[in-house]
Amino acid sequence: MIGEWNNGTGRRKSSVARVFLKKGSGQIVVNGKAIEKFFGRATSIMICKQPLLLTNHAETFDIMVNVAGGGESGQAGAVRHGITRALIDYDATLKPELSKAGFVTRDAREVERKKVGFHGARRRKQFSKR
């Protein structure tokens, strides 16, 4: 462990999360608010805590997160990715376990752009034969 804080940057869709963790009691603060206050849905909170629960470190670290961009789902995914990277920065032996669960890999799916002459990314205008 180098220094007191371990950090990791997580990304998902258009969200970016900078995560800092240090030894503590398991408190998670996102953008200055408790995680329960910041994320409205329980599923988002669960997504954020998955790497900690998998590695049995849920009550080991105090985590401070700065997250920006995107919506609730993207931000939760970015926080999970950032926590995963910070845990690997803390202890590299956790990487195989986290990698097997699929938390280390950055989810590269992005919104496809709308094309000219289409209603959306792929939805075409209605075809009229006559």
Swiss-Prot record:
Transmembrane segments: none
UniProt-recorded Gene Ontology molecular function terms: RNA binding; structural constituent of ribosome
Record's GO cellular component terms: cytosolic small ribosomal subunit
Keywords for the protein's UniProt record, in alphabetical order: Ribonucleoprotein, Ribosomal protein
Pfam families: Ribosomal_S9
Gene giving rise to this polypeptide: rpsI
Identification of the protein by name: Small ribosomal subunit protein uS9
GO BP annotation list: translation
